Amino acid sequence: MSHNMKGQKIRLAKAHKQNTRVPVWVIVKTNRKVVSHPRRRHWRRRSLDVK
């Protein structure tokens, strides 16, 4: 495995971690004003710009 692939794997892992829903405690704390995650990504609809 080259160094390039390792960097790409790290970036993919970061994108995977970022792609989570809003925590329940945030929804409760904000009294449902914050429900959706504006940067949420679906694997089929939006592609990643990973280099």
Curated annotation (Swiss-Prot):
PROSITE patterns reported for this sequence: RIBOSOMAL_L39E
Coiled coil: none
Keywords from the UniProt entry: Ribonucleoprotein, Ribosomal protein
Domain of life: Archaea
Gene Ontology biological process: translation
Gene Ontology CC: ribonucleoprotein complex; ribosome
Any one Pfam family match given in the protein's UniProt record, by short name: Ribosomal_L39
SUPFAM superfamilies on file: Ribosomal protein L39e
Keyword Metal-binding: no
Molecular function terms from GO: structural constituent of ribosome
HAMAP family with a match to the protein in the record: Ribosomal_eL39
Family: Belongs to the eukaryotic ribosomal protein eL39 family.
Name under which the protein is recorded: Large ribosomal subunit protein eL39
Natural source organism: Methanosarcina barkeri (strain Fusaro / DSM 804)
Native organism taxonomy: Archaea, Methanobacteriati, Methanobacteriota, Stenosarchaea group, Methanomicrobia
